[in-house]
Amino acid sequence: MVEGNALRVKGRVLYLTADSKLLTRQLSGETLKFDPSIALIDNISTDELTPGWVCYYYDETLARYCLIGLRGGTIQKDAIRDGGFEVVVSGASKGCGSSRETAPYSEVAAGIRVVIARSIEKIYAQNAQNIGLLLSTDFSLLPRIERGEEIPIEEFTRGLDPISAAIVASGGLFAYNRARMAGRVSPPPTETPARPMTIAEKIIARHAVSQGMSAHGAMAVAPGDALFARADVRFSHEYVTPMADALFRAGFGQDAKIAEPESVYAFRDHLTFLDLVMPKAHVEMGLRDQAASLATTQERVATAQGIRLYGEVTRDGKPAGSEGICHNKVIEDIALPGQLVIGSDSHTCMAGALGCLAFGVGATDLANAWFTRDVRLKVPETVRFVLAGRLAPGVCAKDVMLHLLCQPFWRSGRGIGKVLEFTGEGTFALPLDERATLTNMAVEAGGFTGIIEADEAIVSYLVAQRGLAAADVRARIVKSDPGAAYVESFDIDLAAVEPMVALPGDPRNGIPLRQLRDESGGDVRIDIAYGGSCTGGKKSDMDMYASVLGAALARGQRVSPSVKLYVQFGSQDIRKYAEEKGYLDTFEKAGVLLVEPSCGACIRAGPGVSLGPDEVTVSAINRNFPGRSGPGKVYLASPLVVAASAIAGKIVHPVDLEPSPPGLR
């Protein structure tokens, strides 16, 4: 319990050990003492803390399912809640993946007060701080906790920026913001003198909020500065809107109103096709009705608050999916260069392809931003990637990201919380959709976000897509200053990047595709090929699927009888594009199972999910953490490899199909 400014742990410590038998013994009542030689589980994702189906709940019920998705299946319902644990200990990269606040919330609800890990991912850490869950990477605390010592709260604020430290000391973000609005506390003034800044730093400086909660901007900011920044765009989807609404009303009053609702958006995109794949056991648990309630609650919130809801659509009188995945629609309809965009999803960073600063937040951050219009952040360091040359035929941006993610800088955790800025003539030679793949997957590196300076290609896109005036778009463009400081800079020769595949379990498990047979001891046969999601359901992705499948049809080939190939559109605009290009006919003739716009299989909520642990999927989505798209194994690859593998029945590149498609030889 917390007594004044100190914590005394009365409950047990749970070590999430790599040895499943040792973990089972702890769950059965054995007390394990701290031993630095015992291997702990690394890369525990938020999907493992609270699998997608657990997120249909957003109350104390979450306590019953804490860590139920942990690899190996050792932890069962109620095990954490009923185990008397107050401390959970794990290895590196705790809380990677999704921005879902249900993950730390389930820990708190189950009685956990302290999380200790070798390293902790940025969004998970901020969500935990917001709800009063104490975090540390200092393993020397464990013997002290086991001895029953009082641990000063300062041990959990050491190294934090002043705002984060104050939030932790306050017990969470709502308590801090109530004090801030009442004038009882103030964030530190931003007093950094003029200096050369990166794109991200410039956008943050322009959106900085003064101590009086007005958006006056700052002369300059530098990495480490703590501040609140005014958000131009705030959005959420049905997975998070209900939880954010419950927190919003509890924190600010049942009749509280969202400030500037015209800049707030809601999306029905994640669970549109859940009924098609919900396991019988989940139906029997009542989860169908629970999941359906998320959509109806979001509709109620949107109506009551006057915010724009991107909902479901019909075609010829029949259901036709969602208007679009939030990230695709934010690029198509909403975000602009130079803006600050927050969303209730870790892949909000995809909009950075337009030259805006876009990043994911949890439900508590979002609920507070609905009221205050601002979001707290610590100015992140920036890593620069200078892309030179051109990609070889048959290689695309997905391969670039899988190549980058497997590098030591990211695998070691040194990139956690960094901005990934992509630049160089190789970057600007890529079309918007391919740039969006780069920024989308920045979070897979543990990054804060990804960003690319807007250029004439972006100006032309926004003029054509939205009818904006070119001069107005150009006036919004933000560029890094000469002499801006980067914590690291990497030069990438695009011509040297080769087709990649990420082995199951983590998008950072990338290897060159040519090594897959040796790595796996033979061909990797597949049951499912999935092309969709915000990452793999864009217009350029449709071009790639169609190029491979069209060439296959010309050779008299179709999707292998042993494989189901799903192609799912990221939005109705993308579906219309595919139809106008004649791709729908190509897909149907090739044996593709077409799926209307929605997140679908990426979130284990639509056609394309695996149904058993022995099924193997090759997928164009962005992450393959255990359980993410079903119980089977998921390999990540480019749209080209996904389509070719569906034809071959095993993971291959299009050049391995005989004869190879035109332009890929």
Which residues fall in each region the model found?
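Fe-S-dependent hydro-lyases/dehydratases of central metabolism
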Residues: M1-R665
